C-alpha cells in the first residue's frame, strides 16, 4: 500500500467538541511557525545564542494546513500564529493564505490572528492583509528607545513603532498591543502606553511577568501585579470599571472613565487554568497542552509516516481527554518560587523554551 499524500489525509470529518479531565473544551490553538527571533528580550530570550530546531523538522505549509484541519475537527475555532518571530519565516504569506481560506462556518474557524514583535511589520503588513490575516497583536514593552534597547538587547524601537502605525494605516481592527510589565523596567509607563494605543486604534494588554521557560532572570520582586497596575492607573485616571467577561480569553478588560478600554493578563498572580481552552503546536509539530508543560505529543512523526486525518483526530482527541494541566496554578502554589527551568536544562531541550512554544 502506498503512503497517503497530504491531500488524501485531510478529508473532512464531523466536528466534535472535546473536554479534558477538568471539563475544559478545546477552542484555541497557538501555532508557532518558527522558533527563531530577531530580538533578545530579557524576559524570554536573554541569551545571545540558542539551539534552534532542525530546519528539516519544521512543518511545511501543507503539513501545517493538515494539522490545523485536525484541530478544527475537534473544536478549535481560533488560531493564532506565533513564533519565535513569525515574520522571519519566508513563506508566512502562503501560510496565512492557506489558513485564512479556512475561516468560515463550514470549518468552524472564526478567528485568525498573529502575534509579532513588530520589527519587520511595516514592510510586511500589506502582504499580511492581502493574504487574509484578520487581526494583529504587536508586542511593545516601552515607548522609550533606550529602555527598549535595554529590554530587547536590540536597537529596533523605531521599527516597532512604525510597524504599529502601519497596522492602523492598513485598516486592521481589533488590534492589540501586548506589554510585559516588569517592576523597575517599565511599570511607570502604563498610562503612556494606553495613550499611545488610542492614537493607533489599538487596545493595550498589560501582562504580568511570567516565570516560563526562557525567563531565567525571573524573580517575584520584579512582578508588577494586576493589583499594582490598577492602583497605578486609578491614580492617573480615577475610577476604573471592570468589563464583563464573555469568553475564555486570558485578559480581564477594564474601562477608563472616558470609555477607553485596556486589558490585564494576570497569569502569575491570578491564573486562568480553570477556563484555559488553549494548546500550543511548536514549529516542528510538538503539541503542548500547557505553557508550563515539560513534554508533549509529536504530531509531525505520524503525519510524515502516513497517518490519516482521522488517525490524527483520534490522537488529538485522546490526548485532550487526558489533559489535566494546571501549570500556572501549580507554580503559584509553590512556597519557594524561583526560576522555572535552569539555563542548562533549557539548552538541552529547545522545546522547553518560551520562544519555541509561543506565548
UniProtKB/Swiss-Prot annotation:
Q: Per the entry, which co-factors are needed?
A: [4Fe-4S] cluster
Instruction: Note how many cofactor molecules are bound and how.
Output: Binds 2 [4Fe-4S] clusters. Binds 1 [4Fe-4S] cluster coordinated with 3 cysteines and an exchangeable S-adenosyl-L-methionine and 1 [4Fe-4S] cluster coordinated with 3 cysteines and the GTP-derived substrate.
Q: Which GO terms describe its biological process?
A: Mo-molybdopterin cofactor biosynthetic process
Q: Which GO terms describe its molecular function?
A: 4 iron, 4 sulfur cluster binding; cyclic pyranopterin monophosphate synthase activity; GTP 3',8'-cyclase activity; GTP binding; metal ion binding; S-adenosyl-L-methionine binding
Q: Does the keyword Iron apply?
A: yes
Detail which positions bind GTP. 30, 80, 115, 176, 278-280
Keyword annotations for this protein?
4Fe-4S, GTP-binding, Iron, Iron-sulfur, Lyase, Metal-binding, Molybdenum cofactor biosynthesis, Nucleotide-binding, S-adenosyl-L-methionine
Q: Which residues bind S-adenosyl-L-methionine?
A: 43, 84, 139, 210
> Please, which domain of life does this record's source organism belong to?
Bacteria
Pfam families recorded:
Mob_synth_C, Radical_SAM
Where [4Fe-4S] cluster 2 binds, per the record, is at 273, 276, 290
Quote the InterPro entries the UniProt record gives: Aldolase_TIM, Elp3/MiaA/NifB-like_rSAM, MoaA, MoaA_NifB_PqqE_Fe-S-bd_CS, MoaA_twitch, MoCo_biosynth_MoaA/MoaC, rSAM
Q: Which residues bind [4Fe-4S] cluster 1?
A: 37, 41, 44
Q: Which residues form the Radical SAM core domain?
A: 21-241
What SUPFAM superfamilies does the annotation carry? Radical SAM enzymes
Enzyme Commission number(s): 4.1.99.22
Q: How does it assemble?
A: Monomer and homodimer.
What is its biological role? Catalyzes the cyclization of GTP to (8S)-3',8-cyclo-7,8-dihydroguanosine 5'-triphosphate.
Protein name, entry field: GTP 3',8-cyclase 1
Which species is listed as the source?
Mycobacterium bovis (strain ATCC BAA-935 / AF2122/97)
The gene designation is: moaA1
Amino acid at each position: 500500500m502506498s503512503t497517503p499524500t497530504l491531500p488524501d489525509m485531510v478529508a473532512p470529518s464531523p466536528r466534535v467538541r472535546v473536554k479534558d479531565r477538568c471539563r475544559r473544551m478545546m477552542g484555541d490553538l497557538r501555532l508557532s511557525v518558527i522558533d527563531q527571533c530577531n530580538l533578545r528580550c530579557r524576559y524570554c530570550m536573554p541569551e545571545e545564542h540558542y539551539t534552534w530546531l532542525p530546519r528539516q523538522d519544521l512543518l511545511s505549509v501543507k503539513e501545517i494546513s493538515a494539522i490545523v484541519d485536525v484541530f478544527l475537527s475537534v473544536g478549535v475555532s481560533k488560531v493564532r500564529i506565533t513564533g519565535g518571530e513569525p515574520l522571519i519565516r519566508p513563506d508566512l504569506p502562503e501560510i496565512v493564505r492557506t489558513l485564512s481560506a479556512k475561516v468560515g462556518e463550514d470549518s468552524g474557524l472564526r478567528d485568525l490572528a498573529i502575534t509579532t514583535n513588530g520589527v519587520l511589520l511595516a514592510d510586511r503588513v500589506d502582504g499580511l492583509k492581502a493574504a487574509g490575516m484578520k487581526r494583529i497583536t504587536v508586542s511593545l514593552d516601552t515607548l522609550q528607545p533606550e529602555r527598549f534597547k535595554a529590554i530587547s538587547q536590540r536597537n529596533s524601537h523605531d521599527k516597532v513603532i512604525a510597524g504599529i502605525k502601519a497596522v492602523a494605516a492598513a485598516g486592521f481592527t481589533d488590534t492589540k498591543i501586548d506589554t510585559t510589565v516588569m517592576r523597575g523596567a517599565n511599570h511607570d509607563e502604563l498610562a503612556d502606553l494606553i495613550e499611545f494605543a488610542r492614537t493607533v486604534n489599538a487596545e493595550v494588554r498589560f501582562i504580568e511577568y511570567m516565570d516560563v521557560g526562557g525567563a531565567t532572570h525571573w524573580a517575584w520582586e520584579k512582578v508588577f501585579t494586576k493589583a499594582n497596575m490598577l492602583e497605578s492607573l486609578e491614580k492617573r485616571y480615577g475610577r476604573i470599571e471592570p468589563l464583563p467577561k464573555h469568553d475564555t480569553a486570558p485578559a480581564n478588560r477594564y474601562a477608563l472613565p472616558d470609555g477607553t478600554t485596556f486589558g490585564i493578563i494576570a497569569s502569575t498572580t491570578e491564573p486562568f487554568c480553570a477556563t484555559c481552552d488553549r494548546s500550543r503546536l511548536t514549529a516542528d509539530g510538538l503539541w503542548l497542552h500547557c505553557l508550563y508543560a515539560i513534554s508533549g505529543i509529536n504530531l509531525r512523526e505520524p503525519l510524515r509516516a502516513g497517518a490519516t486525518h482521522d488517525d490524527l483526530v483520534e490522537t488529538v482527541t485522546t490526548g485532550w481527554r487526558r489533559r489535566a494541566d494546571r501549570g500556572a496554578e501549580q507554580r503559584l502554589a509553590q512556597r519557594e518560587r524561583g526560576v522555572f527551568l535552569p539555563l542548562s536544562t533549557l539548552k538541552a531541550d529547545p522545546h522547553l523554551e518560551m520562544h519555541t512554544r509561543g506565548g
